[in-house]
Amino acid sequence: MRSGVFSFCKAIDTFCPLGPWIVTPDEIPDPHDLAMELRVNGERRQQSHSGRMSVTIPQILSNFSALGYSAGDVLSTGTVSGVAGFKSPEERARLYLKPGDVIEAEIEGIGVLRNPVVSWQEGHGTAAPPRIRPWGEDV
């Protein structure tokens, strides 16, 4: 299976952690004015500001409005620049997440989401499925 859609990887079981609580819109005066940081094992990997995002929340809502929204829906806005997938092959080898790593995503006024990285075997109790081939690689 191949996919040119980067977000496809985020739709796999267990790949959308939320919580331990959800902050509602009335608790955030301006969602485009929040400091954001991502750390792996305490090392800052990404740091930016929600005002620098390439797509605004109203644009996201508009783009997906044909799907319809219901009370309780969660809007995922993506991440700030600096993801490992767009680094050099040497940097990717060092930066890609490995079992045992701890990820901390922090957004000002919302909190810190902290999650450990576990192997497929540890998380599911079965062997991992075949890997999806990277973009441009023949099947």
Outline where the language-model segments fall.
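Catalytic-pocket segment enriched in acidic/His residues
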Residues: 1-139
